Amino acid sequence: MAKKITALIKLALPAGKATPAPPVGPALGQHGVNIAAFCKEYNAKTTDKTGLIIPVEISVYEDRSYTFILKTPPASVLLANAAKIKKGSSTPNRVNVGSITKSQLEEIASIKLPDLNTTKISSAMKIVEGTARNMGISIVD
């Protein structure tokens, strides 16, 4: 018989830099999860993606064991890295803060494809393009 899930915790943590300090400690501690073991496991799985924010979905079972699934980095983080900017525009319709090429857009869309509700790369590109527009990033050919 399958173990019963008691909690589903969603966190967005820097790759390879999870520590027992907040937000990890309090989120996992209240469910009785071994925080140090989770941090060690998460850091080991994300060392190759240093510098990115990696969302994680943690399923906690009634015997206090857990499993976790790593998601793809947020499109906004990938777009900011591609455009070499720190943050998006405060007025995206008026002020452009950077630009990316169509090939960079396609690369980001292919990275995000597993987490999006589409299977076509063209649809994924439109989704990521909308995020870019809302950040004040223009797409050039």
From Swiss-Prot:
<comment type="similarity">
    <text>Belongs to the universal ribosomal protein uL11 family.</text>
</comment>
<dbReference type="InterPro" id="IPR006519">
    <property type="entry name" value="Ribosomal_uL11_bac-typ"/>
</dbReference>
<dbReference type="Pfam" id="PF03946">
    <property type="entry name" value="Ribosomal_L11_N"/>
</dbReference>
<keyword id="KW-0699">rRNA-binding</keyword>
<keyword id="KW-0687">Ribonucleoprotein</keyword>
<protein>
    <recommendedName>
        <fullName>Large ribosomal subunit protein uL11c</fullName>
    </recommendedName>
</protein>
<dbReference type="InterPro" id="IPR020785">
    <property type="entry name" value="Ribosomal_uL11_CS"/>
</dbReference>
<dbReference type="GO" id="GO:0006412">
    <property type="term" value="P:translation"/>
</dbReference>
<dbReference type="GO" id="GO:0009507">
    <property type="term" value="C:chloroplast"/>
</dbReference>
<keyword id="KW-0689">Ribosomal protein</keyword>
<dbReference type="InterPro" id="IPR020784">
    <property type="entry name" value="Ribosomal_uL11_N"/>
</dbReference>
<dbReference type="InterPro" id="IPR036796">
    <property type="entry name" value="Ribosomal_uL11_N_sf"/>
</dbReference>
<keyword id="KW-0934">Plastid</keyword>
<comment type="function">
    <text>Forms part of the ribosomal stalk which helps the ribosome interact with GTP-bound translation factors.</text>
</comment>
<dbReference type="InterPro" id="IPR000911">
    <property type="entry name" value="Ribosomal_uL11"/>
</dbReference>
<dbReference type="GO" id="GO:0005762">
    <property type="term" value="C:mitochondrial large ribosomal subunit"/>
</dbReference>
<dbReference type="GO" id="GO:0070180">
    <property type="term" value="F:large ribosomal subunit rRNA binding"/>
</dbReference>
<dbReference type="Pfam" id="PF00298">
    <property type="entry name" value="Ribosomal_L11"/>
</dbReference>
<dbReference type="InterPro" id="IPR036769">
    <property type="entry name" value="Ribosomal_uL11_C_sf"/>
</dbReference>
<dbReference type="GO" id="GO:0003735">
    <property type="term" value="F:structural constituent of ribosome"/>
</dbReference>
<comment type="subunit">
    <text>Part of the ribosomal stalk of the 50S ribosomal subunit. Interacts with L10 and the large rRNA to form the base of the stalk. L10 forms an elongated spine to which L12 dimers bind in a sequential fashion forming a multimeric L10(L12)X complex.</text>
</comment>
<keyword id="KW-0694">RNA-binding</keyword>
<keyword id="KW-0150">Chloroplast</keyword>
<dbReference type="InterPro" id="IPR020783">
    <property type="entry name" value="Ribosomal_uL11_C"/>
</dbReference>
